[in-house]
């Protein structure tokens, strides 16, 4: 009975750790858009201004704006251009990242123009409170006071509406991924003008996503101090019920944007300014499209002869953890670190990342950092492991007595269980202690999996030999004889992938299992014999960095168990016969 409970505990623990996030999102869905709208309206916010960022619903049926002059963007980590037709940020490439591990592969493109197949861009504008005021739109031709935007040279775009209003966008970029855009209006009309400045991120297509419950890709933001994550699918369903609106909320400060696994495009208003956030399903030209917008809650009152200005920051780049932390501190952005999906166990996952990142900067290789990290974890749990292995050794010595009790009381299971428990108590043995180290390994395993899977630092991080990307699966495959046969078995089935490192992991798990005392129940013993095979195939599709961790952890466990048993007075068990 104890062994059955133990086996059940292991299964439940693994299920909870690997499935918690998916179950939570399934059973605790986000409130429907209508309910959120009612809640926001109750905060004293006029309903006619909530979510008032334009969507160009009518313009979406017209052809893309004409191509025109462009303002070049040349910074250390990004390059591209800004269209002067519409002042659209629609051409941005990340200098530090390639699409594949091949250094000759194209650089990662983050933003793309309307004329392409996958438009992804950022726009700025104004909404007047009075009709009849001409404001810049998607076809507006702006003038730039320079040809190239660099970190040392901001550029101002301007447009005169011909009726006494001059609209200006002063654009600056730093050495990393942060733009600042100051929207200003000069009023020479002779009367006051009331305007709401806005900004929006638009993705006029639905991208392919990883599809994992442990990773969010889609619309994201920290609004009123709360993280909001809406998938593309949820945006479609919520938007269909509420005229395209999936989420809206008024907040002082915050941030919002669209996130991919490694990349983020986010709007960051002044953190002391009251703004309205909205997430929308836009359906441009009848296909899926998405918009994240922010608009000033309180309008700019531009007096006659005066000028107004408001500044918004735009993050467009890779979700480098240290950079997010830096920007969070510099601009007082609330919880900007949550752009990286560290998950519900972030209180474990984040410290693990920082430890691995520190070790990486110490040794220069994330694979080696994982090995050192594993040694440190093993050392921290050594006292517990020592106690566990001593109890396991006692269990091995008690095996003949337990077998004798089973034979004596085979017709009375209740009495047999009582006698076995009395024997455990008398000898000071704990049948569950042998699996305690494995149970403790699961949260470490899950947290390390999150770190390797979601952080940009692990992307294309090499190890040794054939491992060029710790975040990807082992590229070798037993089923094509490790590349000797010219075909890809995964085209037949995704399960036909078994690399060298998963095989090493399975072998070390088998050796570790043989050092444990045999289970008294032959049925459960046979079940556990298949565990190395099951885990080998399971981990074959996991990031190879995680498989390396598990393999190294198994080897350390074998050595640790051998050392502990050698130091005790109990006889050191031999490997069980196969």
From Swiss-Prot:
The primary location reported for this protein is membrane
Quote the subcellular location field of this record.
Answer: Cell inner membrane
CC per GO annotation? plasma membrane
Gene Ontology terms for molecular function: membrane insertase activity
Q: Where are the transmembrane segments?
A: 7-27, 362-382, 436-456, 491-511, 530-550
* Keywords per UniProt: Cell inner membrane, Cell membrane, Chaperone, Membrane, Protein transport, Transmembrane, Transmembrane helix, Transport
Biological-process GO terms, alphabetical: protein insertion into membrane; protein transport
Q: Where is this region: Disordered?
A: 35-70
- Secretion signal, residue range per the UniProt entry: none
Bias class Polar residues marks the residues at 37-50
Describe its assembly: Interacts with the Sec translocase complex via SecD. Specifically interacts with transmembrane segments of nascent integral membrane proteins during membrane integration.
In the record, the note on similarity to other proteins reads:
Belongs to the OXA1/ALB3/YidC family. Type 1 subfamily.
The job of this chain, per UniProt, is described as:
Required for the insertion and/or proper folding and/or complex formation of integral membrane proteins into the membrane. Involved in integration of membrane proteins that insert both dependently and independently of the Sec translocase complex, as well as at least some lipoproteins. Aids folding of multispanning membrane proteins.
Q: What PANTHER family does this protein map onto?
A: CYTOCHROME C OXIDASE ASSEMBLY PROTEIN COX18, MITOCHONDRIAL, OXA1
Q: What name does this protein carry?
A: Membrane protein insertase YidC
Q: Which gene encodes it?
A: yidC
